[in-house]
Amino acid sequence: MSRSSATLIGFTAILLWSTLALATSSTGAVPPFLLTALTFTIGGAVGIAAGLARGVGLSVLRQPWPVWVHGIGGLFGYHFFYFSALKLAPPAEAGLVAYLWPLLIVLFSAFLPGERLRPAHVAGALMGLAGTVVLLGARAGGFGFAPEYVPGYLAAAACAVIWSVYSVASRRFARVPTEVVAGFCLATAALSALCHILFEPSVWPVGSEWLAVVALGIGPVGIAFYTWDIGMKRGDVRLLGVLSYAAPVLSTLLLVVAGFAAPSGALAIACALIVGGAAVATLLARR
């Protein structure tokens, strides 16, 4: 598989993640850890079924413990700290801090062998971050980082660091088959179910809400993690980091099309910054 093909496959994860908000809005009052448990169970099943269809047996899950620490720590760790951040701090501020992960991916990629971090990559990532600031700030009517929410900000920062480290470190585990991600998903589902039992009331999906849960499990919480794994292991990590800032903008555009949000000047500015950042990272970095 070529580097450009792997990058394109990795970008499909970003496209799928942009549907998260719209799909999640159709799951009703299902609490976050229960929703995570349900969707990751489906996502894990999708991976196992796809592997078996290609002749890859369950023996592929026999991996050294560092592989499991990396995978479960990345998937479950990110979601645990993200949900904690949303409970401990206002969603806008928590979301902004959490969305430092694309920039961190770009910066951390400099530590990978054979990768060279160019100023254009950093500039593109900063433009993407600026677009996210404009978009999230407009939604919330501004930001107000208050001292009493420091635990929430720290939790959001933790999830940003965890996901960026997981993503970049995937290159270190390039020989581990992508099918192993199914095991990460199922382990994340089990730990999320435990957190649900300990911390949340049980509100199960009803009627058409199950369709949204299944769609999440197949797409943004299923296929996306497998394609992201391919992109991180074989694609352009720096470019995928910059392109990740497209997710919140595409997510908002989908909400506008579906009638859940209104178009705004902030959305247009965010689009311009993120598209411009991607262009800077793609074109100037080649010179």
Curated annotation (Swiss-Prot):
InterPro entries: EamA_dom. Changing W101A: Exhibits decreased transport activity for threonine, but not for methionine. It is found in: Cell inner membrane. It holds the Pfam family EamA. Residues 1-5, 55-65, 112-118, 171-176, 234-236, 285-287 are cytoplasmic. Changing H79A: Abolishes the transport activities for both threonine and methionine. GO terms for cellular component: plasma membrane. PANTHER family: ACYL-MALONYL CONDENSING ENZYME-RELATED (PTHR22911), EAMA DOMAIN-CONTAINING PROTEIN (PTHR22911:SF76). The overall structure is basket-shaped, with a large substrate-binding cavity at the center of the molecule, and is composed of inverted structural repeats related by two-fold pseudo-symmetry. The central cavity functions as the binding site for a wide range of substrates. This is Aromatic amino acid exporter YddG. The gene is yddG.
